[in-house]
Amino acid sequence: VSFAAESYGYAPEEVAARTEKALSLVKLEGKAGTAVYRLSGGQKKLAAIAGVLTLSPELLLLDEPSASLDPKNQRNLLNILRNLPSALLLASHDLDFVYDCCDRVLVLHKGRLVADGPGETVLRDKALLESAELELPLRFQ
């Protein structure tokens, strides 16, 4: 988790503080010294996100961030992302997570943009989603 902050050149005390804060955000406080191979798949994903958060990025690029997370950790990640001052660019097939996380939604199908608008509008449009081979989020079914 501390690798990014160390590589960026922060002083050791700053690295420790940023790492502790990031681990706390993702609810992995007790895992600071744990070998990666001892973490579950979901914990590995959260640890990777924590590592990025040590840099306080202005933009986060996330690919399927909710995949391999149990419902509790999905909610935790959602709360983290909602409260970050960072902009998010998120690729996901989990449209319920997208709805909860994103203000603006773009839908791509076969490499082409087929929709761009507020999540409330785009993710309720059954015909549009079906044309892109997607299903309505569960909350709208």
List each language-model region with its residue ranges.
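Catalytic Walker B motif of ABC-type/P-loop ATPase nucleotide-binding domains
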Residues: 60-63
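ABC ATPase "signature
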Residues: 116-117
